[in-house]
Regions:
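Aromatic-rich carbohydrate-binding modules that target alpha-glucans
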Residues: 24, 36-48, 54-101, 107-123
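A general sequence property marking short-to-moderate contiguous segments
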Residues: 6-41
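N-terminal accessory interaction module
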Residues: 1-3
Length: 125
């Protein structure tokens, strides 16, 4: 099996590939969002006619966050997530080519210099 072509979709608008609406962020900040499982984690989706996976994680004390897995040989320098512009502490990104069944973790560089690898509750797309 050949190496998959995986790329990040970027846009001029910081939340153009986000599953979060302004209402979601309001509910999240007030502690009243009861369906965060629909937003955080990994979600198969199509963006700009490309199939892939949208990832989102709450990491308010992070300096950098990336997604690692077999698809990038567990390399934390690839598949970097972007912090939301609204300072919610949510990091997110869409990557084409990451499909169903992929195992993943979040690689988190904290603002205190720690490096952590955190498994998501699902940990499989």
């Amino acid at each position: 099996m050949g190496k998959k072509a995986i790329s990040k979709i970027n846009s001029e608008e910081p939340d153009s590939f986000s599953l979060f609406s302004d209402l979601d962020i309001h509910l999240f900040r007030s502690g009243k969002h009861f369906k965060l499982y629909e937003k955080l984690g990994a979600h198969l989706t199509t963006f700009k006619k490309q199939e892939g996976t949208y990832f989102a994680v709450w990491a308010p004390n992070a300096r950098a966050v990336s997604v690692i897995g077999n698809f990038n040989h567990w390399n934390n320098n690839d598949h970097k997530l972007s912090p939301r512009w609204d300072e919610s502490g949510i990091w997110e990104g869409f990557f084409s080519g990451i499909g169903k069944g992929e195992v993943y973790k979040y690689a988190i560089h904290s603002n205190t210099g720690e490096y952590l690898e955190k498994a998501d509750r699902k940990s499989v797309v």
